[in-house]
A protein has these predicted regions:
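Basic amphipathic alpha-helical segments that dock to polyanions
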Residues: 60, 64-67
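N-terminal helix-turn-helix DNA-binding core of bacterial DNA-binding proteins
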Residues: 12-59, 79, 86, 94
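Beta-hairpin "wing" of winged helix-turn-helix
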Residues: 68-88
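The DNA-recognition helices of helix-turn-helix-type DNA-binding domains
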Residues: 41-42, 55, 67, 80, ...
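C-terminal regulatory/oligomerization modules of transcriptional regulators
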Residues: 1-14, 69, 74, 91-130
Length: 130
């Protein structure tokens, strides 16, 4: 039976999962680390690179552009010589930081347990799946 309300709504299977788009923002390797480091205020590119261990210049550039495009941070260029570019969380970026802070805290608290579980798993004689 078709109702007027059901005709105006697309079928659930056809709806794109918009939550997945948000998870793409926060689920990559570097985005949350950038957001965490900007939570105390604006930073320049070199300050961010120094603060995030292991990130390449290219990956930091890609991550910053992506977060800027998504409205998580702003990029400000000051017309001085040499040009001064800084990055700062937007109000939406600040709420993302608040929402993800517990995840980063959980990660820090459980990293040793994760390492131990991985070592136990890797030490098993046969870890192949059927």
């Amino acid at each position: 039976m078709t109702t007027p309300d059901s005709e105006s709504r697309p079928a659930r299977q056809q709806e794109p999962c918009r939550t997945r788009e948000v998870l793409d923002i926060v689920g990559d390797k570097w985005s949350l680390l950038v957001v965490r480091n900007l939570s105390q205020g604006p930073l320049r590119f070199t300050e961010l690179k120094r603060a995030i261990d292991g990130i390449s210049q290219r990956m930091l550039t890609v991550t910053l552009r992506s977060l800027e495009r998504d409205g998580i941070l702003t990029r400000t260029v000051r017309n001085v010589m040499p040009p001064h570019v800084s990055y700062e969380l937007t109000p939406m970026g600040k709420t993302l930081r608040q929402a993800t802070a517990p995840l980063l805290e959980w990660s820090t608290a459980h990293l040793a347990h994760i390492d131990a579980a991985r070592a136990t798993y890797d030490a098993r004689p046969d870890t192949s799946l059927p």
